[in-house]
Amino acid sequence: MTSRKYFGTDGIRGRVGQFPITPEFMLKLGWAAGMAFRKMGACRILVGKDTRISGYMFESALEAGLSAAGADVLLLGPMPTPAIAYLTRTFHAEAGIVISASHNPHYDNGIKFFSGQGTKLPDEIEMMIEELLDAPMTVAESENLGKVSRINDAAGRYIEFCKSSVPTSTDFAGLKVVIDCAHGATYKVAPNVFRELGAQVVVLSAQPDGLNINKDCGSTHMEALQAAVLAEHADMGIGFDGDGDRVLMVDHTGTIVDGDELLYIIARDLHERGRLQGGVVGTLMSNLGLELALAEQGIPFVRANVGDRYVIAELLERNWQIGGENSGHIVCFQHATTGDAIIASLQVILALRRSGVSLAEARLKLRKCPQILINVRFAGSGVDPVSHPSVKEACARVTEQMAGRGRVLLRKSGTEPLVRVMVEGEDETQVRAYAEELAKLVTEVCA
């Protein structure tokens, strides 16, 4: 397949004001997308965004480009990414567009697409859009321009969808939960979902100002949530990222429960009830302890490349239902077509209530192996540190020294200029030493 010029592992992302995250490019992208989706005839496209300030600028640019191509546009306003996937399906739209940089700071932004089925856009459509981006822009005849309208009840529709993922008899009365919305796209919907199910809800970071999204809050900065759970004597805390497709949790002792542990809790509950279809999909970054714990339950486990689109592709290929990443992307295909943080957290709470144990007790059933991850800034000097001979030789040596009781993984981030150095094994001191050794070598090679 031809290599992509603009699309990365999860759409298009970068620094606001730097190509391609500019109004000019977004105008052209909207036009190219509209032209691609209109090849089958008239179409309408949903557009949603998170709460970062640049979203308004890019929403207007995309709207103009789509309309110029003759595509009708439905504006959703600030909504979680999985909500846009869901609403794209329910409105029978040809595609959905999300303006978001997920867990990144406010000065980044990006675009990702959903197909009309609420799934990640097929590669061939992405390539068609890329080709059109390099073609001259034309404008439809006046009578064929796309119409633009705003959907005012999007939040209510999505809240009801989330609630429909649990049995109608579900009552969270007696549950006290702290929710950190990261000043992001879940700030309106998440608290209402849990309140309407009967929980006592304490809300953090739900006052977006366009600049504070993900700033010292949410699933990438859990300290405030940990402190609030302890101060409020809550049963648990739930931390979302800026666009609502990642979730981490905090138990009543203030301990973080990561995506591997949440995935295990959901999968074990389904397995014990005879509801697990197939096995579980993790990633190259999933903790070895998850694989071992699932094996003890007789649950198959496979690893996909890092990125929720690869987890989803593996689930589709195997006709399995459950997968995710330790970062908190969790896919529950029996309920949603993509990673949905609110739905995943609801499934965890249901599993806990069925088993009668606390989140703290449930997480201890998964014995994680020490895993050290070091991010090394990579400026793109022309040298690929991951495939550099000295780095490959060092990785092979460390792997041999661990004698089958650990893993080494080096990979470039698909969304940031980073090389991720991960070492995993039984002895934390040894694992840390190996990781620091490899990170130092990668730094030297990058320099």
UniProtKB/Swiss-Prot annotation:
HAMAP family, per database record: GlmM_B (MF_01554_B)
Gene3D superfamilies: Alpha-D-Glucose-1,6-Bisphosphate, subunit A, domain 3, Alpha-D-phosphohexomutase, C-terminal domain
One cellular component term from this protein's GO annotations in UniProt: cytosol
Phosphoserine: residues carrying this PTM: S102
Cofactor: Mg(2+)
Annotated Pfam families: PGM_PMM_I, PGM_PMM_II, PGM_PMM_III, PGM_PMM_IV
Amino acids binding Mg(2+): S102, D241, D243, D245
Functional note: Catalyzes the conversion of glucosamine-6-phosphate to glucosamine-1-phosphate.
Annotated source species: Pseudomonas syringae pv. syringae (strain B728a)
Keywords associated with the record: Isomerase, Magnesium, Metal-binding, Phosphoprotein
Biological process terms in GO annotation: carbohydrate metabolic process; peptidoglycan biosynthetic process; UDP-N-acetylglucosamine biosynthetic process
Catalyzed reaction equations: alpha-D-glucosamine 1-phosphate = D-glucosamine 6-phosphate
Family per record: Belongs to the phosphohexose mutase family.
Residue stretches in coiled coil: none
Keyword rRNA-binding on entry: no
One term of GO molecular function: magnesium ion binding
Residue positions of the active site: S102
Enzyme class, UniProt record, top EC level: isomerase
Protein modification: Activated by phosphorylation.
Entry's EC annotation: 5.4.2.10
InterPro entries: A-D-PHexomutase_a/b/a-I (IPR005844), A-D-PHexomutase_a/b/a-I/II/III (IPR016055), A-D-PHexomutase_a/b/a-II (IPR005845), A-D-PHexomutase_a/b/a-III (IPR005846), A-D-PHexomutase_C (IPR005843), A-D-PHexomutase_C_sf (IPR036900), A-D-PHexomutase_CS (IPR016066), Alpha-D-phosphohexomutase_SF (IPR005841)
UniProt superkingdom: Bacteria
Cofactor note: Binds 1 Mg(2+) ion per subunit.
Name of the protein this chain belongs to: Phosphoglucosamine mutase
